[in-house]
Amino acid sequence: MAQKEIINKKNTQKNSSFIESNNLTSFDFFDAKKNSEIETISTGSLNLDEALGSGGLPLGRIVELYGNESSGKTTIALNAVASFQKAGKTACYIDAEGALDLAYAKSIGIDLNKLLIAHPRHGENAFALIESLIKTNKISLIVIDSVAALIPKQELEGTIEEQTIGLHARMMSKGLRRIQSILPDSKTCVLFINQLREKPGVMFGNNEVTTGGKALRFYSSLRMEAKRVELLKDKFNNYVGIKTKVMVSKNKIAKPFGVAILEIMFNRGFVHEHEVIDLALKFNVVVRAGNSYSFNNESIAVGKEKLLNVLSEKPALFEQIKELTVQQLANKNSFQQTAS
């Protein structure tokens, strides 16, 4: 047995004796050994997994994904749902906006027969549902789309003339406190999609702020900002997608401030082939010499477009490169988590 394991075992026995001898067994104490490793599930994007530094979204934590309209937030969330399903997990999509495109979700790879979809009547109803889902210990991902659409019950039942300043923020604060109290003992990731608003009267600096007050940014272990940086066109000059930059503005799991560039096509979501090639080149799984690309010391293509064509024609080769790239990414993320 390693020296570190012996020390951990002695500390565990010492802590247990202290708790029992002082009649503290009725209280919940943090099990450091049990919670030392945080389980993560891929976001469905290798580039984003690398930027997060943890390999994906953490279970037992709150995550906020925010940005302006048409920046790819919903697509990122839907790809996460598809990834969780591929890992054998169950997901729930709380569609507070009532704007979920089921056909698009299916094109991304989501099994609609296995996806729970909810339309809460008001914000308090949504938080009650989230709390109940967490307690079942059967739901691994809960997506709330979006914070801005979580209308407080008091506002919904009142008249439109009534002043409700601060009501939304108070509801968010209370709801988040309740779910945070039970979330660490669960295997559920709660992902909130949020929007940016302009702060009136700000002349200098950043004049944008997320909706719902400050509670969500406080309780979130991860915060990701999505920003559209380019519109993608095909050879006929038609718009076919967007390029989005995602910055990890807060990270309590690994190193913060990672950046991922994502290509999102309107008809199918992420362009996984480009992500695999970019990371394969970064990790030297595929080696570039001038304009030539080689794998396992064998030349496979000349030019990047030719490389894409070869990999699309040879799916077995693509899967082999992808598998090795994912292994390299997992090793890197494991090192970053240990270092952090």
Swiss-Prot record:
It comes from the Bacteria. It is found in: Cytoplasm. InterPro entries: AAA+_ATPase, DNA_recomb/repair_RecA, DNA_recomb/repair_RecA_CS, P-loop_NTPase, RecA-like_C, RecA-like_N, RecA_ATP-bd, RecA_C_sf. GO terms for molecular function: ATP binding; ATP hydrolysis activity; ATP-dependent DNA damage sensor activity; damaged DNA binding; single-stranded DNA binding. Pfam families: RecA (PF00154), RecA_C (PF21096). One of its GO terms (biological process) is DNA repair. Keywords: ATP-binding, Cytoplasm, DNA damage, DNA recombination, DNA repair, DNA-binding, Nucleotide-binding, SOS response. ATP binds at residues 67-74. GO terms for cellular component: cytoplasm. PROSITE patterns: RECA_1, RECA_2, RECA_3. Can catalyze the hydrolysis of ATP in the presence of single-stranded DNA, the ATP-dependent uptake of single-stranded DNA by duplex DNA, and the ATP-dependent hybridization of homologous single-stranded DNAs. It interacts with LexA causing its activation and leading to its autocatalytic cleavage. Belongs to the RecA family. This is Protein RecA. The lineage of its organism: Bacteria, Bacillati, Mycoplasmatota, Mycoplasmoidales, Mycoplasmoidaceae. The gene is recA.
